[in-house]
């Protein structure tokens, strides 16, 4: 580790998020919803998918889901503000559609449309809340960066997990867990975002000078409503990336079975559950986050 705080790079980082919203409509068949959402007033742009005035994009994703992508921000506070704006745009869109139906039929629909930041629907299909971080191209993404940051991703649910109810395998009763999207994740990393369902997508599209920058595209995290949880998601991940970019060793925190550890941590709201590191030490999610916070504090 480095002893001088000035050795760790400090400064703004470009980051952004993308959210595929789930729309609940109990007035019509679910399978024709995408076509009707496409006609919402919020989509009446000159060209579907163009940028909005605040630099964001609101469009229909390849999976037919309405998606809001924030503009590029220079820090976690900017992402929080941009996500809140996105929530208001989506909410205004569904409210406009409800009013349009009432005007057309002369009778208000019995049940209003509702938009949710929900990543797994009742059929078990997953949607995405994606995080994007611009990082310096100093090390190999798959061989160095992913192993170093995975323990952070697997344990950060203690402060940024959205939570979910899952049936207990023993008695079938619903149990509260700390994560939602994580139950549908199949690998820590992959270049195939839809078939392998990775926590990190290896697609490297920095949209910047590619010899200097790369993009970390995180697809396995949860979506949050609470501003502090959104901020913590991006601020903590950016801080850990600073450690990695500066060459600080995090190998003692690498987990033996990352996805298993994530689910073990998430299944215990008391935060006492442990998982084994590659060095044979049993650690809790809180142990990992405390160790990362200590190293950030020592070096920033």
Language-model features, listed with the residues they occupy:
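Terminal catalytic/cofactor-binding subdomain
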Residues: 1-116, 145-162, 166-167, 190-201, ...
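Short, solvent-exposed loop/turn segments at secondary-structure junctions
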Residues: 73-75, 120-122, 138, 183-185, ...
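Histidine-centered divalent-metal-coordination microenvironment in nucleic-acid enzymes
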Residues: 119-136
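Extended, Lys/Arg-enriched charged tracts that mediate electrostatic binding to polyanionic substrates
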Residues: 136, 175-187
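A short alpha->loop->secondary-structure connector
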Residues: 140-143
């Amino acid at each position: 580790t480095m002893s001088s705080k000035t050795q760790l790079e400090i400064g703004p980082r470009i980051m952004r998020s993308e959210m595929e919203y789930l729309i609940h409509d109990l007035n019509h068949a679910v399978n024709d919803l995408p076509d009707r959402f496409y006609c919402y007033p919020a989509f009446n742009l000159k060209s579907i998918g163009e940028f909005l005035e605040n630099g964001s994009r609101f469009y229909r994703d390849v999976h037919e889901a309405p998606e809001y992508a924030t503009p590029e921000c220079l820090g976690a506070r900017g992402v929080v503000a941009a996500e809140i704006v996105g929530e208001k745009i989506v909410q205004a869109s569904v409210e406009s559609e409800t009013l349009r139906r009432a005007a057309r039929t002369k009778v208000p629909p019995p049940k209003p449309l509702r938009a949710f930041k929900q990543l797994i629907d009742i059929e078990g299909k997953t949607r995405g809340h994606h995080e994007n971080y611009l990082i310096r191209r100093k090390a190999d993404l798959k061989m160095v960066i992913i192993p170093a940051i995975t323990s952070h991703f697997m344990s950060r649910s203690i402060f940024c997990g959205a939570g979910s109810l899952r049936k207990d395998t023993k008695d079938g009763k619903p149990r509260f867990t700390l994560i939602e999207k994580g139950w549908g994740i199949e690998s820590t990393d992959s270049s195939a975002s839809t078939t392998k369902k990775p926590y990190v997508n290896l697609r490297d599209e920095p949209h910047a000078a590619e010899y200097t920058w790369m993009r970390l595209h995180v697809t396995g995290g949860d979506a949050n409503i609470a501003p502090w949880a959104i901020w913590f998601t991006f601020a903590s991940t950016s801080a850990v990336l600073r450690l990695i970019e500066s060459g600080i060793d995090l190998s003692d925190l690498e987990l033996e079975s990352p996805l298993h550890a994530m689910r073990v941590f998430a299944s215990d709201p008391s935060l006492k559950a442990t998982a084994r590191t590659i060095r044979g030490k049993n650690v809790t999610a809180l142990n990992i986050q405390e160790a990362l916070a200590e190293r950030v504090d020592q070096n920033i």
